[in-house]
From Swiss-Prot:
Residues 447-456 have a biased composition (Acidic residues). Residues 21-40, 98-262, 285-325, 339-525 are annotated as: Disordered. Residues 110-122, 171-182, 201-223, 230-242, 314-325, 339-354 have a biased composition (Basic and acidic residues). Residues 510-525 have a biased composition (Basic residues). It is a peripheral membrane protein. GO terms for cellular component: actin cortical patch; plasma membrane. It is found in: Cell membrane; Cytoplasm, Cytoskeleton, Actin patch. Residues 285-297 have a biased composition (Low complexity). Residues 148-162, 251-261, 382-398 have a biased composition (Polar residues). It comes from Candida glabrata (strain ATCC 2001 / BCRC 20586 / JCM 3761 / NBRC 0622 / NRRL Y-65 / CBS 138) (Yeast). The lineage of its organism: Eukaryota, Fungi, Dikarya, Ascomycota, Saccharomycotina. Keywords: Cell membrane, Cytoplasm, Cytoskeleton, Endocytosis, Membrane. Cortical patch protein involved in endocytosis. This is Protein BSP1. GO terms for biological process: endocytosis.
């Protein structure tokens, strides 16, 4: 099956689109040289940009003034008279300016090479330049790099100038040298002084011209290739010791001998004038490896170890001095026997001591109460005053009664309700019925009073009369429908019966009445 050309092109397009979508987003390249210097920022703040922009605008769009107005037109015909001194000064200044201009051309400021940091996605650049490898021989030295003119002048000056002086020694060196001279013999001290004077004379004389060195000899003198390494000081050997008492070890211990920090003068001069080795190869063969100092083996007997110089490896902990033990023989303390009977030899009962302490407390002496006589009491009774508490209470009660009307304030007057005609008619009928009932009651009461007047009043008769009055008042004042008499027909009822077709509107007695101020719900429940 061969694919069509159109299908292949379509598939290629799809693959290209997928590759573009799946690629990471392109990061914008940063500028190679960012202007982060504070000088440039200060220039912008000072307003140099504003000045430059205004100058450029005026130069491009401003009106061009003629040269004659400013006074810059040249006049070749004009001549000036100048003194001879001024003319020479002017010529001298011109010559100096020309020399400065020429020197600036020769000594231009070489800018430092800026190492450009490659971008994140950039590939490493490999310089495909051939590297020339020279076969180094022992006799021929490699060619030296070309020096600048300034560096060559400095070299010539150094050869002709006086040799460099040795660094001054510290004050401590002189003190140590004096101490060594006192200890040593007089002969040795005189020899040392002669050697020192000879060395100083040699240094003062001019050094000989440097001989031609081969490449291997120069490597010998190089500080980087050291032929012999100093033997590293191995740690002091540890020796096991017997278990010594703390006080004895302090007495036997010798004071720590501090090694002298400064070396003797002879050793220093010996190192300075030490003979050189026979070439680079011999020095390499004779060089020793920088071997590490091997640790000392762990001793079998565990215990306290000290150094050869008397110094211990670990700081010994000071043990407190323990006093010698005393042989204390404890004796059994025998307690005195107590008689259970609680009686002594005489047969008297012995009281315990704590009771005696309680009894010894101080008690106040008894005071005899004085009995007053009758005439004295009568005389003092006259001076007595009545109790005033009751009077105060009465006065307070009067004040409270006076304050009652102020506290019990009356509410606002209730507005009178307007009475309609049908209600007024109803009230009249009810009043008539009440008057008829009261008349009947009065008649009954009159009959009873006559009987009561005839008969003597007794307690039973009084009770009966009171009960009758209560019954009559209940019949009159009762609001039950059964006790009330039948209501008489009013004019309104007669009109409604005559006109059956007219629709009677519902009468709401509470709707038309004028209400007072609206009731507020209680806030504090």
């Amino acid at each position: 099956m061969t694919k069509d050309a159109e299908v292949e092109e379509f598939l290629k397009r799809v693959e290209d689109l997928d590759g573009k979508i799946n690629k990471p987003p392109i990061v914008k390249k940063k500028p190679q040289h960012l202007s982060t210097t504070p000088i440039e920022n200060d220039d912008t703040l000072d307003g140099n940009l504003v000045y430059k922009s205004a100058f450029n605008y005026e130069k491009s769009f401003g009106s061009k003034k003629p040269v004659g107005v400013i006074g810059l037109d040249k006049e070749d015909d004009r001549k000036f008279l100048v003194s001879e001194e001024d003319y020479k000064l002017l010529q001298k200044i011109k010559m100096e300016q020309q020399q400065q201009h020429l020197s600036e051309r020769h000594h231009r400021h070489i800018e430092p090479v800026r190492h450009i940091i490659p971008d994140r996605h950039s590939k490493p650049i490999f310089h495909n330049e051939p590297v020339i490898v020279r076969e180094e021989s022992e006799d021929e030295a490699p060619p030296l790099p070309s020096r600048n003119r300034a560096s060559s002048e400095n070299v010539v000056k150094s050869t002709t100038s006086a040799p460099p002086l040795l660094p001054r020694r510290r004050y401590k060196d002189d003190i140590t040298a004096k101490k060594l001279d006192v200890v040593s013999d007089n002969v040795n001290s005189s020899n040392k002084i002669k050697e020192m004077s000879s060395i100083s004379d040699k240094n003062k004389s001019k050094p000989p011209l440097p001989e031609k060195k081969t490449f291997l000899k120069s490597l010998e003198d190089n500080k980087l290739t050291t032929s012999n390494y100093k033997d590293q000081d191995k740690g002091p050997e540890l020796k096991p010791t017997r278990n010594v008492d703390f006080l004895e070890s302090v007495q036997l211990k010798s004071p720590p001998q501090s090694p002298s920090k400064m070396k003797t003068i002879e050793e220093k001069h010996f190192k300075l004038n030490s003979p050189k080795k026979d070439g680079f190869i011999v020095s390499v063969l004779s060089s020793e490896e920088n071997s590490r100092s091997s640790l000392s083996e762990k001793p079998s007997n565990e215990g306290n170890y000290h150094l050869s110089g008397g110094l211990t490896t670990k700081a010994e902990k000071k043990k407190p001095v323990v006093p010698p033990k005393k042989d204390i023989k404890l004796k059994d303390i025998e307690l005195e026997k107590v008689d259970k009977t609680g009686k002594g030899g005489d047969g008297k009962q012995i009281e315990p001591e704590f009771q005696k302490i309680v009894l010894n407390k101080r008690t106040p002496p008894p005071v005899s109460k004085r009995k007053p006589s009758i005439p004295e009491a009568l005389l003092k009774a006259q001076n007595l005053s009545k109790n005033t508490e009751n009077k105060k209470s009465v006065a307070q009660s009067k004040e409270s009664i006076d304050m009652l009307p102020k506290l019990n304030k009356k509410g606002p007057p209730v507005p009178q309700r307007k009475v309609s005609m049908p209600e007024a008619l109803k009230k009249l009928e009810s009043m008539k019925n009440k008057n008829s009932t009261t008349e009947n009651v009065q008649k009954d009461n009159g009959e009873e009073s006559e009987i009561s007047d005839s008969e003597p009043e007794s307690i039973n008769n009084k009770l009966e009369s009171v009960l009758k009055r209560a019954n009559t008042s209940g019949q009159i004042g009762s609001k039950h429908i059964g006790h009330l008499p039948p209501r008489a027909a009013t004019t309104g009822d007669l009109l409604s019966k005559k006109e059956p077709h007219t629709t009677q509107s519902l009468s709401h007695p509470n709707k038309s009445r004028s209400r007072g101020p609206k009731r507020k719900l209680p806030t504090k429940i």
